Amino acid sequence: MDMMAIQALSQADMQKVNESILAQLNSDVVLINQLGFYIVQGGGKRIRPLIAVLAARALGFEGQKAITCATFVEFIHTASLLHDDVVDESDMRRGRATANAEFGNAASVLVGDFIYTRAFQLVAQLESLKILRIMADATNVLAEGEVQQLMNVNDPQTSEENYMRVIYSKTARLFEVAAQAAAIIAGGSEAQEQALQSYGRYLGTAFQLVDDVLDYSANAKALGKNVGDDLAEGKPTLPLLHAMHHGNAQQAALIREAIEQGGKREAIDEVLAIMAEHKSLDYAMDRAKQEAQKAVDAIQILPESEYKQALISLAYLSVDRNY
């Protein structure tokens, strides 16, 4: 099943999700409407809400609560992006100016806060203490991940284990929430809930690993942001760490300096050459494929359906993309 088939299968549900997102963004405060609509209409893969609606359908559930789950997960993600771009001082996302570049840092932070709190209002509508607890824990872990990544910036001593922990906190945990909350709403068994939770964790990890590879291998137009941003921001991601640890003394020193100083986009060609020599992008991509396969294996216990097949295909497609 290709992405077009998955989109066709989920079109009606995702249309409801998009309508819900726009409705829940509505506020009497004009700036919230302007900035909120700016960011949600800027595109994006909507993969987290897609996971939620597919997971619910895979367990035979098709009620409004699945749409609410999908919406609150996307709101947490959107709020984190607003805050991320301020912290990273990013000026381009999804092929256009970031919200902070367009509206300023203060507005981005405050509207991000509004969207976070709106997500909690949506969870309250579900009347599930378990989902509330899962969401509260996830947002706390996400915040910890943001702080840990901030600490890792310009630090070439960052370990691969530390990097993977940040990936889990910042990305995979929210994928987990999308799949697990859908399973709870659908009334799935404990085994099915755990299976979907694992699916989300592995898929989220694979997804972020591929994003980190694409930062060095995609073109800016396809990627929707500047290539080499991670290097320019001094972020030690897996491809960079692998190249540094496998390069000779001179190569390791060059990468170490690039991480420590940041802002050295002019070093990108040399870094890419070192990565190519040591197959660092291949290494990171292989790790991503392993995680995607774990995601597929995790949901084999789900009943056979076109929605289960869509989840399986989504895992494979997440590591076979150029944006």
Predicted features along the sequence, with ranges:
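All-alpha prenyltransferase/terpene-synthase fold signal
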Residues: 1-323
